[in-house]
């Protein structure tokens, strides 16, 4: 506790040993206008050389290493995806036109509406997450505009709650997005084997990550923020701060709907009646 009579700055440092407590969650997801959060890692401790870091890390239990070295909270009964996030990261690159693309969306209001865009390298069966979007307390009109900006032609897969009727218009939520020009799939998401349970998709994503067939552009900070908080408690996935993860699951489990279709480029029209042959007739005689 501190009283800032002089209007100064208070620094608070801590290691999140108790996991995602209310205080940690508040700083990681709901910062006030006068607050800021900086993840200080061992890389900021210039007095620690690489040999010392390796020695300390080796002495720590595996589940504490990310928490001690990177300030990432120990979460519940464990991370849903217990991997080094650096193994998922790739430098952004121009996506080949022959890779199909797809978007997954998770609807929200008090919690964010989230969308994730993926590209599929069919030669190696590798999924690449190349963009994401997350926003709370906005209308479908706002979300639709953000989705269209990233390619109106990209198909969008959506969960079963998109069939529910919007309280304002009385229309199904998915239909509202469709009317706004979003290329919504014709029906709600289902796993490739049927049903809408979470675990089959989670296991497939984990296997892809473990075998190097799931990659994420390294600048997608919001996506990695959720990855670090996506955890289980008593064996069950905690349904909080999981919007981008859900959208990713919908997309990665719907590769059969990924599309190559793009707007065809129209031939450019002549901008004048100037006839090159007529004015250079002598050159062709």
List each language-model region with its residue ranges.
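ATPase catalytic-site recognition across NTP-hydrolyzing enzymes
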Residues: 45-107
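Generic detector of well-ordered alpha-helical packing
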Residues: 102, 107, 162, 243-244
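Stable alpha-helical structural segments in soluble proteins, enriched in small hydrophobic residues
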Residues: 243-255
């Amino acid at each position: 506790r501190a009283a800032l009579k002089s209007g100064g700055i208070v620094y608070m440092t801590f290691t999140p040993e108790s996991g995602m407590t209310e205080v940690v969650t508040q700083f990681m997801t709901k910062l006030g206008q006068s607050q800021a959060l900086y993840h200080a890692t061992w890389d900021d401790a210039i007095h620690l050389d690489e040999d010392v870091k390796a020695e300390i890390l080796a002495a720590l239990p595996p589940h504490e290493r990310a928490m001690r070295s990177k300030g990432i909270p120990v979460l519940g009964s464990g991370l849903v995806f217990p991997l080094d996030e650096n193994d998922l990261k790739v430098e952004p690159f121009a996506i080949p036109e022959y890779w199909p693309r797809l978007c997954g969306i998770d609807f929200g209001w008090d919690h964010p509406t989230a969308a994730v865009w993926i590209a599929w390298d069919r030669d190696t069966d590798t999924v690449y997450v190349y963009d994401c979007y997350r926003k709370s307390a906005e209308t479908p009109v706002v979300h639709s505009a953000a989705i269209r900006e990233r390619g109106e032609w990209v198909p969008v897969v959506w969960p079963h709650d998109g069939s529910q009727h919007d309280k304002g218009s009385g229309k199904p939520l998915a239909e509202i997005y469709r009317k706004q020009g979003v290329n919504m799939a014709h029906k709600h998401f289902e796993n490739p084997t049927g049903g809408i349970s979470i675990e089959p998709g989670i296991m497939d994503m984990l296997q892809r990550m473990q075998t190097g067939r799931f990659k994420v552009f390294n600048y997608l900070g919001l996506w990695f923020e959720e990855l670090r908080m996506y955890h289980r408690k008593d064996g069950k996935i905690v349904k909080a701060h999981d919007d981008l993860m859900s959208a990713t699951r919908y997309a990665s489990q719907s590769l059969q709907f990924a599309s190559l279709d793009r707007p065809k480029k129209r031939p450019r029209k002549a901008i004048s009646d100037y006839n090159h042959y007529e004015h250079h007739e002598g050159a062709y005689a």
